[in-house]
Amino acid sequence: MRIGHGFDAHRFGSTGKLILGGVEIPHEQGLIAHSDGDVVIHALCDALLGGAALGDIGRHFPDTSAEFKNADSQKLLHRVMVLLKEHGFKVSNGDMTIIAQIPKLAPYLPAMRETLALALGLPLQRFNIKATTTERMGYIGRAEGIAAHAVVLLLEEQ
C-alpha cells in the first residue's frame, strides 16, 4: 500500500469557465491556468503520481508545452490512470477537500464525486469530496482563488 497527497491552487481572473472536479460551476470568473485550471483534478493527479513515486503533474504535463494549453484536466487524469496501471498500481480509495470562499460548492459536490469516482474506477463509497472555506482569511478568504487537497491510497497489483 502507498499513500499519495496532492495540492493545487489557482487564482481567479480568467474569463473562461470555472471547472472543478470535471464539473462546470456557474461563476463570473474562471481560474488562471495553462490548462482548464481544474484545481481539484490537478491535486488528484499529483496525489496519484506521488503515491506511485512517479513525479508530479508539472513533470508529466508541463505548462511550457503547447500540447497542454487549455487541456481538459479529465483527459490528464485519464493519462495518469493509464500510467498507474502500467506501473502496477490501482486506487483503493480517495478523499479530497476543496478550499474556496466563493462560489458555494455544496450543490456540485455529488456530481464531482460521481465524475471522479468513475474516473478512478471506484465505487462511490470509496471516494469522498468536501468543501470548506478559510473563514475569510488569506488569499482564499479574500476570494482571490481556490485550492484543493487530495489523499489517495494505492494498491500494488499482484
UniProtKB/Swiss-Prot annotation:
It is an enzyme of class 4 (lyase). Its EC number is 4.6.1.12. 4-CDP-2-C-methyl-D-erythritol 2-phosphate binds at residues 8-10, 34-35, 56-58, 132-135, 142. One of its GO terms (biological process) is terpenoid biosynthetic process. Involved in the biosynthesis of isopentenyl diphosphate (IPP) and dimethylallyl diphosphate (DMAPP), two major building blocks of isoprenoid compounds. Catalyzes the conversion of 4-diphosphocytidyl-2-C-methyl-D-erythritol 2-phosphate (CDP-ME2P) to 2-C-methyl-D-erythritol 2,4-cyclodiphosphate (ME-CPP) with a corresponding release of cytidine 5-monophosphate (CMP). Homotrimer. This is 2-C-methyl-D-erythritol 2,4-cyclodiphosphate synthase. The lineage of its organism: Bacteria, Pseudomonadati, Pseudomonadota, Gammaproteobacteria, Chromatiales. The gene is ispF.
